[in-house]
Swiss-Prot record:
This is UPF0386 protein RSKD131_0371. Belongs to the UPF0386 family. It holds the Pfam family YjhX_toxin. InterPro entries: YjhX_toxin. It comes from Cereibacter sphaeroides (strain KD131 / KCTC 12085).
Length: 87
């Protein structure tokens, strides 16, 4: 599966315990997203388009309206990086 650099970066953040916070409009459509790391830092280059691509590929999931997190399929697709050791 082809995963862009921004998607890969977001998946690494999510794999290390990050979350994607989302806002909905009156029609229940997602209008804004923020990718937050485990430490509370915001991933600046994460856009709504990246979020929609990750969701379309089923690499992220949300259960019962909770923040989006990485799915099992996303964990299997993310490439290992030496500098992302979670500490």
């Amino acid at each position: 599966m082809n995963i862009s650099r921004n998607e890969q970066r977001a998946l690494h953040v999510l794999a290390l315990g990050g979350r994607i916070l989302h806002e909905r409009d009156d029609r229940r459509k997602i209008t804004a997203v923020t990718c937050v790391t485990r430490e509370g830092m915001i991933l600046s280059d994460f856009a709504l388009e990246t979020f929609l691509r990750l969701r379309r590929k089923r690499l992220i999931e949300s259960r019962s309206g909770s923040p989006y997190c990485i799915s099992k399929r996303g964990r299997l697709s993310v490439r290992a990086q030496l500098d992302n050791q979670g500490a």
